[in-house]
Amino acid sequence: IVLYTYILYDVDELMYREEFMNIICFGDSITRGYDVREGLGWVELCSAALPAYHMENHGIDGLSVQGLINYLESWCIDKSYEENRYICIMCGTNDILQNRDSDYVYNKLIKAATIAGEKGHVILGLETQIDSEMDGLNHVVVDVNRRLQDYALEHGLQTIDFYTVLHEADQIGQIVFAGEVHPNERGYRLMAYKALETFTRL
């Protein structure tokens, strides 16, 4: 799998920039890379494509948005703000599957983003769809993502639209999910392509 085509900078310039880039990814099993072999999740694919970046994957299976807040609070205790640190957060599917509404999920994610913003630049990942509109829950994902995009625009934050890249592939008949929630190898690869569009332009 070659993802280097997304590195569009002059090579010398990019390598100079890479040496100072720290990208820390927090989220649930979709961030961790559930349902594919080790190394084939989107974070690991990005890390392989950007070998001079320092990237960390803090994805946790089953993580809720409150769990994300708790984890971030613990992680942040001994950290100071760093200009070269980018903190990517994506979470919410597990709460939506437990019938939490969009207000609950959105407000918790904004709290998480506020905590993360005290330690670095925040990137908001837009959660992927709940495939096949299981129990009508996907509309909650769409609403949360829309509100996150509005918040990011208002506050000058970057987003990674994982939802659209998988939804569009799904709509044209590509198989990008391993089940109702988790992407398959192709899905994670598309997510990595999308993330690299942002990461290579930081």
Predicted regions and their residues:
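Compositionally biased, intrinsically disordered low-complexity regions
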Residues: 1, 5-8, 13, 110, ...
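Alpha-helical protein-protein interaction elements
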Residues: 1, 8, 12, 26, ...
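Intrinsically disordered, low-complexity segments enriched in small/polar residues
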Residues: 2-7, 14, 51, 84, ...
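Serine-esterase "nucleophile elbow" of acetyl-processing enzymes
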Residues: 11-61, 65-66, 71-83
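Alpha-helical cap/lid subdomain in secreted, periplasmic
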Residues: 70-202
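Conserved catalytic region of serine esterases and O-acyltransferases that act on ester linkages
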Residues: 1-9, 16-22, 154, 189-202
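A generic signature of intrinsically disordered, low-complexity regions enriched in glycine/proline
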Residues: 8-16, 32, 62, 98-99, ...
